[in-house]
């Protein structure tokens, strides 16, 4: 009979606090809300997906924010690699970024991003790391990893929506995750991926 063993392994999910300051978070939200001509709406009811986003790479007026995000991301990713004990011969020597997006989820009992993974085909298989930066405090709308435990009494790992925090994790199938519905106020995040080059 085939026997199985469970191994304790790092989940490679990390949260770093206060990487983006309050003023920059508020500025990005304000710019998002005053740029409705740049909004792209996404809605797939069968997949529990509904949100509005701006793809910052499509609009030159966001260059300053993108540069700032990339700079802080470099520091956070270096900390992540160190904290996860990722050796240099394992980490990509050179990488690039997928276009950064700002997403808004309204407290309308509809906006959310259902359970999914970020690498699903050959085209997006160049992604090797995912990140979200939370732009506002929100007691709901957290990011949920249902297959990772973070305490003896829970069967999932939950990243709360706390302004300025960055969540970093691998984008492949073991890291299936969901963005829960916000309840009382909109949820804003900056999201993107690191790519193999």
Per-segment meaning from a language model:
Residues 1-166, 172-197:
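Fe(II)/2-oxoglutarate oxygenase catalytic core
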